[in-house]
Swiss-Prot record:
Organism: Scenedesmus vacuolatus
Cellular localization per UniProt: Cytoplasm
Cellular component, GO annotation: cytosol
Residues where D-glyceraldehyde 3-phosphate binds: 144-146, 175, 204-205, 227
Assigned keywords, A-Z: Cytoplasm, Glycolysis, NAD, Oxidoreductase
Oligomeric and partner information: Homotetramer.
Induction: Induced by sugar addition.
Role, per record: Key enzyme in glycolysis that catalyzes the first step of the pathway by converting D-glyceraldehyde 3-phosphate (G3P) into 3-phospho-D-glyceroyl phosphate. Essential for the maintenance of cellular ATP levels and carbohydrate metabolism.
Similarity annotation: Belongs to the glyceraldehyde-3-phosphate dehydrogenase family.
PROSITE patterns per the UniProt record, alphabetical: GAPDH
Name of this chain's protein: Glyceraldehyde-3-phosphate dehydrogenase, cytosolic
Catalytic activity line of the entry: D-glyceraldehyde 3-phosphate + phosphate + NAD(+) = (2R)-3-phospho-glyceroyl phosphate + NADH + H(+)
Catalytic residues identified in the record: 145 (nucleophile)
Biological process terms in GO annotation: glucose metabolic process; glycolytic process
Designated gene of the protein: GapC
Length: 312
């Protein structure tokens, strides 16, 4: 539900998998022909090379038709009729359990909110996904892109060395909520300034959200963001006071081991001289940059991890 940046890229990601089939897309503001155009041409992730067609009935990708719907009221979306068991709620509007009940009334069995939620259970892959109970959880949140980057990193460090306190800064690429030129933004004055002309300090709930998925870190971690004028890919700076003294090499060894073991495919690790554009379309939730981090003392360390905030 919703075919903006997230909805469009969720569709791209499903085409790489054989165990997921998209049967319908609901967006009241986008007709099938335009939807096909949006899907095929992407300024960040490049042109989709398969065959894409669109008309008033839906879009067809490589011969597979996907029905398009245009319901404003989510209770009117016939998910059951089109055979949709799972709904990705990616409008950014319906982010509570109560609001997502509308999808269940329409015949869906499960709803995944593609954003943080005030009351839906929040799950981050590699961190607390083992707590998911299919019998109990029908509406869940997949948290935010930044939480998905930060939480795996924080989990490994906390499990191995203990985190006494930590501050996070995300240097975050521009997103659709920002303005191309200066404009009114009553709730966030700085957020109303032109995205391409400024580095904009901003708030983020990502660090506090980590306390929801890693309860032992609740109250020990907070953070903020700098919005910067790049199209995509962001980076987390996690500065920690550790419970146990450690060498920087020991911390990197623990993170590398996790990236090759229990968090493989979720947490990445690199010792290359990388920059942000190297992570466009990277599916990892978080990639530790071993060369970018620094340590001041055995209990005071800054860790750096990259993420494609649209695709990871």
């Amino acid at each position: 539900n919703g075919f903006g940046r997230i909805g469009s890229l969720v569709l791209r990601a499903t085409l790489d998998r054989k165990d997921v089939k998209v049967v319908a897309i609901n967006d009241p503001f986008i007709e099938g022909e335009y939807m096909a155009y949006m899907f095929k041409y992407d300024s960040v992730h490049g042109r989709y090379e398969g065959d894409v067609q669109g008309d008033k009935h839906g879009i067809t990708i490589n011969g597979e038709q996907i029905k398009t719907l245009a319901m404003m009221d989510p209770t009117q979306i016939p998910w059951g009729e089109v055979g949709a068991d799972y709904v990705v709620e990616s409008t950014g509007v319906f982010t509570t359990v109560d609001k997502c009940q509308a999808h269940l009334k329409g015949g869906a069995k499960k709803v995944v909110i593609s954003a943080p939620s005030a009351d839906a259970p929040m799950f981050v892959m590699g961190v607390n996904a083992d707590k998911y109970d299919p019998k109990q959880h029908t509406v869940v949140s997949n948290a935010s892109c930044t939480t998905n980057c930060l939480a795996p990193l924080a989990k490994v460090v906390n499990d191995t060395f203990g985190i006494k306190e930590a501050l996070m800064t995300t240097v975050h690429a521009t997103t659709a909520t920002q303005k191309t030129v200066d404009g009114p933004s009553k709730k966030d004055w700085r957020g109303g300034r032109g995205a391409s002309a400024n580095i904009i300090p901003s708030s983020t709930g990502a660090a506090k959200a980590v306390g929801k998925v890693i309860p032992e870190l609740n109250g020990k971690l907070t953070g903020m963001a700098f919005r910067v004028p790049t199209q995509d890919v962001s980076v987390v700076d996690l500065t920690c006071i550790l419970e146990k003294p450690a060498k920087y090499e020991d911390i990197m060894a623990a993170l590398k081991a996790a990236s090759e073991g229990p968090m493989k495919g979720i947490l990445g690790y690199t010792e290359d001289d990388v920059v942000s554009s190297d992570f466009v379309s990277d599916p990892a939730s978080s990639t530790v940059d071993a060369k970018a981090g620094i340590m001041l003392s055995p209990t005071f360390v800054k860790l750096v991890s990259w993420y494609d905030n649209e695709w990871g």
